[in-house]
Amino acid sequence: MQTRFVSPVNHDEEQDEPSVRPGLLADFIGQDSIKDALTVAITSARKRNKPLDHILFSGPPGLGKTTLAHIIAQEMNSHIETTSGPVLDRPGDLAALLTPLKDRDFLFIDEIHRLSPVIEEILYPAMEDYTIDLLIGEGPSARTIQLPLERFTLIGATTRLGLLGSPFRDRFGIILRLDLYDPSELTVIVTRSAGILGIPITPEGAAEIAGRSRGTPRIANRLLKRAYDYAIVRGTGSIDQNIANTALFALGVDQKGLDILDRRILEVIANDFDGGPVGLKTISISVGEEPRTIEDVYEPYLIRIGFLKRTPQGRMITSAARDHLGNSHTRDLTSFL
């Protein structure tokens, strides 16, 4: 199984690395409009001695939704419990998380779009009235009890905002979408992370990594570590532009941040379907990847850089994508892999 170095999805081994996550809004790089909105909301809540309104973050994976949730709790001097939508199977699981929360604490639910309808319905009164209704027992003897909750704030994160029902979505007072980062912002992030991790890097080396990180800090930090491995084994231990370029080439990451899986999608559309339009399910079968993964993980960046178009008839590649696929360096990279 091939490792995808430019996947925005978190790798398990990355949990064990020293944290490069910022702890305060002032240290969070990029997403300026979101930081401004959160600064106003947090300052207002503090002055009013009230909990924050419930918050919903949306956007592609790897952009900092989880980091922002922890920063918000830190800025409010409050505790945060974290979980994810697929984990919350039973009402009792949710109650076990909500009942210990103290006034102005936080519950963060990642992949909140994957909550079951039953859990969503239990959250309605929890979000509005700070109570939850639980069914105790079975059959004729079953009864409903109401448990009071402290004033808490729910923070949800989703990559698929459209999958949340309107009644649930409307209960969030603050809804914010994170967008992909500019290369200049990612260069600052790479430089900052290198400093925290003790990795020697030049400004040109940081910019080279940033330019291939698909607008995603998680990918930038991952490529930084892999480039450092290469610098230690094949270089002098420091990452300059040449080392970064050579290391990323060896990892199969081209100048635009595309890997073999991205190029496979583009090549299937270009060569097998004459540039499109072609349906998502057909692409999925051709490249051997789930439709949802293609739509959530691959397509946002390909669309962002102008290589892919979504039309009512299906997906189409652009002339820019054809030019990129025809680039000699890209052809060499495909052969290398």
Swiss-Prot record:
Region (Large ATPase domain (RuvB-L)): 1-181
Name of the protein in its database record: Holliday junction branch migration complex subunit RuvB
Catalytic activity: ATP + H2O = ADP + phosphate + H(+)
Domains as described in the record: Has 3 domains, the large (RuvB-L) and small ATPase (RuvB-S) domains and the C-terminal head (RuvB-H) domain. The head domain binds DNA, while the ATPase domains jointly bind ATP, ADP or are empty depending on the state of the subunit in the translocation cycle. During a single DNA translocation step the structure of each domain remains the same, but their relative positions change.
The encoding gene: ruvB
Keywords assigned by UniProt, alphabetized: ATP-binding, Cytoplasm, DNA damage, DNA recombination, DNA repair, DNA-binding, Hydrolase, Nucleotide-binding
Binding site for ATP: 21, 62, 65-67, 128-130, 171, 181, 218
Job of this protein: The RuvA-RuvB-RuvC complex processes Holliday junction (HJ) DNA during genetic recombination and DNA repair, while the RuvA-RuvB complex plays an important role in the rescue of blocked DNA replication forks via replication fork reversal (RFR). RuvA specifically binds to HJ cruciform DNA, conferring on it an open structure. The RuvB hexamer acts as an ATP-dependent pump, pulling dsDNA into and through the RuvAB complex. RuvB forms 2 homohexamers on either side of HJ DNA bound by 1 or 2 RuvA tetramers; 4 subunits per hexamer contact DNA at a time.
Entry keyword annotation includes DNA repair: yes
InterPro entries on file: AAA+_ATPase (IPR003593), AAA_lid_4 (IPR041445), DNA_helicase_Holl-junc_RuvB (IPR004605), P-loop_NTPase (IPR027417), RuvB-like_N (IPR008824), RuvB_C (IPR008823), WH-like_DNA-bd_sf (IPR036388), WH_DNA-bd_sf (IPR036390)
Location of the region described as Head domain (RuvB-H) in the Swiss-Prot/TrEMBL record: 255-337
Subcellular location, record wording: Cytoplasm
